[in-house]
From Swiss-Prot:
Role of this protein: Efflux pump; part of the gene cluster that mediates the biosynthesis of viridicatumtoxin, a tetracycline-like fungal meroterpenoid with a unique, fused spirobicyclic ring system.
Gene Ontology CC: one annotated term: membrane
Organism listed in the record: Penicillium aethiopicum
Protein name: Efflux pump vrtL
Keywords: Glycoprotein, Membrane, Transmembrane, Transmembrane helix, Transport
Disordered: region residues: 1-59
Amino acid sequence: MSKLSDNHSSASEGEKEAGDLESGPTAISSEPSFDDADRDPNLITWDGPKDPENPKNWPKGLRWKNTWTVSLFVFISPVSSSMIAPAMSDLAKSLGMHAEIEIYLSLSIFILAYSIGPIFFGPASELYGRVRLLQISNVWYLAWNLGCGFATTKGQLFAFRFLAGIGGSAPLAIGGGAISDMWTAEERGKAMGVYTLGPLLGPVVGPIAGGFIAEYSTWRWVFWSTSAAALAVQVVGFFWLQECHPGTLLRKRRDRLAKETGNENLHTAEKVETLGYKLLHAFERPVKMFTTQPIVFCMAIYMAYLFGISYLMFATFPEIWTVVYHESPGIGGLNYLSIAIGSFIGLFFNLKLVDRIYRSLKARNNGVGKPEYRMPSLAVGSVISTIGLFWYGWSIGNTHWIMPNIGALIFAMGTISCLQGMQTYIVDSYQTYAASAMAACAVLRSLCGFGFPLFAPYMYNSLGYGWGTSLLAFITMVVGWGAPFAFWHFGPRLRAMSKYASG
């Protein structure tokens, strides 16, 4: 067993950097050092820093294939979240919805379920792995989403939408951890950009298709078509998706070696914990981090705010184009392309610049990287988002239809830059506890995505599109313009004071 000890003793820089191993509420308790392994010949870790089974050492092509596959799972659920927007009026007539809040609830209740999923799916992926959870949750989502198409009462629709949303929340809860499993800090920006694109583009692509489905078919086909797409993603995942959670891979290695050697004393560095114990801490740690960590608190608030505005925009788009600009549902749905194009432009520049800026600033700092080197993306994105909101709000109904689209495009450009900057900043700041920090963000983000569309019609009825959207823009200025500079200066001190932060 001495060879086993030598080969599996190294915590390795890869694993050390995989402080991102935590994808749920309970992390590996401590990273084993070389001395730990020397004292414990039964400890199973990676075979040094270059272990090919460590996901961070996989060939780049394999890592990108896994990243894109995870992103497909992340993409399909947000498509379903907003695809019914162009069909809400037909759906309301069919199921007897009369109050505005009921109509918008049919869209946003799906997002409410997103606040529950991360609490369960994060810790469950610690025990059962990323792949199994992604596939099982997708089947759950598919079944209930299919049921929405057969709903005969508004109560059934609300219940089925909520249950479908719970399954659809799993990729959003697990995806960020899966990305950090495979990529180092210097590489992570591009991968996180691809991952971020799913939640941002999904709600945009959905209404484009939903508009034509609503115009030429019935609202029921909105649900049936997304279920067919989810089935296609399931098939792709079956063939392409590979387990990348280091803790799960090391447990499999331990089981294989125990079978080969007959040594049942072999073990990994993880604590053996039940799902119930993990669930308890899954709820506890995100709450603690949200209430005690200024970085998590501020990033969660701003991320949730931008997410809420995005869903407010998705929900109110159909009325703007069909009522104000007198377009058909199908043509009106095409206006969502402005958000998609803006997202692509924002992602393109971030992919080109975010990791380059990080490496440049790291080189100037004697090769030492800091999470604060993600702040330029947030600063620039916040300014762009604010400009987009003002442009969008004051051009509705007062100018040619292209002008609100340009405003929405500018807002989307800035938003994806902000989201990517905030997500990578949190992952870099709380590597070991990144998933708990992201879970706190996800819960608040989902609550805003649920709530903002519900007050949107009342806000616009009272203030109009110009002043209503300007109110949102002024809040973006206050929060988004100041936060990047505050964390650039005070972030290192806040992290030094934190028991959760790294670096």
